[in-house]
Amino acid sequence: MSTLLNIDATEIKVSTEIDDIIFTSSPLTLLFEDQEKIQKELILESFHYHYNHNKDYKYYCNIQGVDENIQSIDDIPVFPTSMFKYSRLHTADESNIENWFTSSGTKGVKSHIARDRQSIERLLGSVNYGMKYLGEFHEHQLELVNMGPDRFSASNVWFKYVMSLVQLLYPTTFTVENDEIDFEQTILALKAIQRKGKGICLIGPPYFIYLLCHYMKEHNIEFNAGAHMFIITGGGWKTKQKEALNRQDFNQLLMETFSLFHESQIRDIFNQVELNTCFFEDSLQRKHVPPWVYARALDPVTLTPVEDGQEGLMSYMDASSTSYPTFIVTDDIGIVRHLKEPDPFQGTTVEIVRRLNTREQKGCSLSMATSLK
């Protein structure tokens, strides 16, 4: 199994409806009703695929009284992400698994997720799809500075790998090695792109970008980006929660440090190792769920969907993965909202509020895992 999967974005074959949506459509042109229709069709198709090709998942469905003749995607059994910490669940044949990716593992046991080539290609497609919220850029119009390792150094740690995939889409300079930030190289790379007259995109974990801002302040380094720079964060603050800034204060820090024209130039990405898709923000900093993913907020006790806009336990069904059934319930409390006309960015958004913090709430999810062991 190789962690150094060689993907050429120009050679990916678009052969199915889901691939057509992921690789060729734009999130800016799909109406909410169209997205909902696509979602139901693709999620049902994914369920039938995993039900018929994964005996462990089929068993899990059957003991809950569910067979392949379901009528609604809400009837699809979901399982807790904690299951991936204790079981190697995969639909793809072992010979087709490119790598077992792991969570960043801020504490405790790490999750292990199998991915085949098609799943990884579709993950890349979700990055390209989400980047369209920034605008339509040709390769020669935009260059990136990534405060992380390239994909050959990211190994199997998931979010480092996800963030490194941008190098397949645009010219990218990487300025972190072995978790050591080269601040001088980062600033030189930003200035080099600016001199070329190209659009700039700075990418990294929020804490690394926070450290860059403080480095620039300490060394009296100014960078007047104006309207020609995007900053994309991802991965959260992890073990640096004590130093974490709220979104408003973080936005303000970046606005001042880089002399940005507008807060819409700052975006955040959501992803987790058990999910095969990245959620990008629109210009209003709302994280959008692509139409091949079904997101719900569930009551932590009954595991039934709560009202639109209410807090609940986050659950996702992701049709893009062929290597494992992505029908999961997480340890995040969040809010799902549905945006319809006349909103300029129609679709479904998610807002992650916090992690579960009580044994009682976690027990609701963990008890489900025993059925798969």
Swiss-Prot record:
Keywords: ATP-binding, Ligase, Luminescence, Nucleotide-binding. It is an enzyme of class 6 (ligase). It comes from the Bacteria. One of its GO terms (biological process) is bioluminescence. One of its GO terms (molecular function) is ATP binding. The keyword Ligase applies. Pathway: Lipid metabolism; fatty acid reduction for biolumincescence. It catalyses: a long-chain fatty acid + L-cysteinyl-[protein] + ATP = an S-(long-chain fatty acyl)-L-cysteinyl-[protein] + AMP + diphosphate. It holds the Pfam family LuxE. Its EC number is 6.2.1.19. Belongs to the LuxE family. Acyl-protein synthetase activates tetradecanoic acid. It is a component of the fatty acid reductase complex responsible for converting tetradecanoic acid to the aldehyde which serves as substrate in the luciferase-catalyzed reaction. This is Long-chain-fatty-acid--luciferin-component ligase.
